[in-house]
Regions:
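Acidic carboxylate diad motif detector
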Residues: 1-23, 199, 203
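Positively charged, helix-rich recognition surfaces that bind polyanionic ligands
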Residues: 27-319
Length: 319
């Protein structure tokens, strides 16, 4: 290996990063340099990532992101590169269930008759079959994590090419992933599950996506704005000039004038109409620009249906 001269580079610090890859430990040396990273160029000498100008309103959910900009509107799944991520998520679940079955078969003394784990100190034994499955599960999780990060970077670069002012709501993933505290019974007298959005947040990384977006815009000379909590983009109806609370299941809903809109996209449109002076929704901008962006939204939804793209929790039905 040839030595690399670092005399002309200011080195900030060095980090040793151990990783388990395909069952073997590997140690990587991370060199962190001072200053800003140089821009990337393609093989033709052009900038690899373009920086756009304009406003982008984005509604970041637990599994999807909807955005409205001066050039295009969009709605897509978070942290997804093709359809392979859904297959990988399913394989993670299958491996985890296989590990649980093996653990129960090897350690029956640690479980109650109803299947719950006994309290107190326990000694666990793991079979060779369990260890092999665990290694496969760990390797699959590692690959999925890398693919998620690559997908996040690709989406962040695309959004930066649409504009230089990014407007969104504050992060709330840490609150959504917590289990519900209240015990509620449904109409049949059964307990409602206390699980919320932990699995979706783990698979789609909305907070990681938002952090990457914030860093991307601020480092590249853009602006990142989080609206105040009283903004309530998901409840406002500009045709009625009122805040109307909706059910979580209402993904497609009708405005007061009878227009059907996709909920996430409409929230991104209201974020696009943010008034930086009053820190509130610019109602005049909503009225003047809604028809133009509504036509773009309808065209985009038709494109999703024609290409049979499954957008999670969007309410868009694919034949």
């Amino acid at each position: 290996m040839k030595p690399i001269a670092l005399a002309h580079i200011n080195l900030a610090y060095v980090t040793l990063v151990p990783k388990m890859i395909r069952g073997k430990y590997r140690v990587y040396l991370h060199l962190t340099l001072e200053g800003k990273a140089k821009p990337k160029y393609d093989r033709f000498g052009d900038l690899r990532h373009k920086f756009g100008k304009g406003i982008i309103g984005a509604d970041i959910g637990t599994q999807t992101v909807a955005y409205t900009s001066q050039t295009e509107v969009g709605l897509k799944n978070l942290s997804e590169r093709g359809n392979s991520i859904q297959k990988s998520e399913r394989m993670e679940r299958l491996y985890y269930r296989a590990m649980d079955r093996s653990r129960r078969a090897t350690n029956p003394q640690n479980y109650n008759t109803n299947g719950t784990v006994k309290e107190g100190h326990k000694t666990w034994k793991y079979s060779n079959h369990y260890k092999r499955i665990k290694n496969r599960h760990s390797e699959l999780c590692r690959i999925n994590a890398i693919n998620r990060q690559l997908a996040i970077n690709e989406d962040a670069n695309h959004l930066r090419s649409l504009g230089d002012v990014f407007i969104t709501e504050p992060k709330n993933a840490s609150k959504l992933m917590k289990r519900a505290k209240e015990t509620i019974f449904n109409s049949k007298g059964k307990l409602n599950r206390k699980k919320r959005f932990g699995k979706s947040i783990k698979n789609r990384c909305p907070s990681g996506f938002q952090t990457s977006i914030e860093k991307k815009f601020r480092v590249s000379g853009g602006a990142y704005i989080e609206v105040p909590n009283h903004y309530r983009a998901s409840q406002y109806d500009h045709t009625a000039d009122a805040y109307i609370k909706k059910k979580l299941s209402d993904r497609m809903y009708k405005l007061a004038d009878g227009t059907w809109v996709q909920r996430d996209w409409y929230s991104s449109f209201l974020l696009y109409c943010y008034d930086d002076q009053t820190k509130n929704i610019d109602k005049k901008k909503c009225v003047s620009e809604f028809n133009n962006y509504y036509e773009k939204e309808k065209t985009f939804i038709e494109w999703i249906k024609v290409n049979k793209i499954k957008v999670l929790n969007s309410g868009i039905k694919i034949a």
